[in-house]
Amino acid sequence: MASRSVISFLYQQGGLSLAELPPAFLAPALYSTKASFNSQRSQFSTSSSPAARDRSRFRGVSAIHRTGPKQPLPVSKYPLPKPASPEQQEKRPANPDHGLWGFFGPNKQAIPTPEEEYAHGRAWTIQELRQKSWDDLHCLWWVTVRERNRIATSNYERKRLAAGYGDFEADNRDKTVRATQHAIKHVLRERWYAWNEARELYNGGYRPSPDEVLEEETETAMPTEVMPEELDSSTKSETTTSKNI
């Protein structure tokens, strides 16, 4: 195919005719593609050569390994601003009600004493949280989150300074806070299950009658009756326990 293309090209340009060309084995140069390509190709390039790739990771960082910019960059005629010294700056008064103080104790110290870490109450029970509203549970949850953040901050500072005290009290306090969080999750899970079951009943076509609704409201509103016998037994048990104490 290459020999045919060269021969046809010479014939079209008015060169040697097909009859005047010698055979290929006598003049192989006439039939080679390199001769035709080299005659048309220039020996130099007019396009600018691309810039060499700079493989230095320290260009512009180190004074020894830097190579400088590859192209001229604009420079502003205005000087760079200089930072003011701390002595010239006005001291702002500390805000005692700032939200970041919640990461510290009441005395606003990074590491509380073991007595302060141990001075806490018990965890909220599930029975107590069932009586709370959605807003109360929401507020209580974020109170526990802030308390755990405060405990984590004190643990970090205690470990950084190698204080050597307060780890046991902080762990007990964190366990109490986590118990409250588990109780909140349990109550919310119960309410979600109740809502899901009510939704399935409603979608299934169940509609409570007005009498059933009134009975449920009266049962929840009225307190449970206590028999006199139960009161007598409770008073007797209290007197016996007081005597034992």
UniProtKB/Swiss-Prot annotation:
Gene Ontology biological process terms from the UniProt entry: mitochondrial translation
Record's subcellular location: Mitochondrion
Pfam families from the UniProt entry: MRP-L47 (PF06984)
Primary localization: mitochondrion
GO cellular component: mitochondrial large ribosomal subunit
Gene Ontology terms, MF aspect: structural constituent of ribosome
Domain of life, per lineage: Eukaryota
Keywords from the named record: Mitochondrion, Ribonucleoprotein, Ribosomal protein, Transit peptide
Region described as Disordered: 36-98, 207-245
Low complexity biased stretches: 36-49, 234-245
Gene3D superfamilies for the chain: 6.10.330.20
InterPro entries referenced in this protein's UniProt entry, alphabetically: MRP-L47_sf, Ribosomal_uL29_mit
Family: Belongs to the universal ribosomal protein uL29 family.
Assembly notes: Component of the mitochondrial large ribosomal subunit. Mature mitochondrial ribosomes consist of a small (37S) and a large (54S) subunit. The 37S subunit contains at least 33 different proteins and 1 molecule of RNA (15S). The 54S subunit contains at least 45 different proteins and 1 molecule of RNA (21S).
Listed name of the protein: Large ribosomal subunit protein uL29m
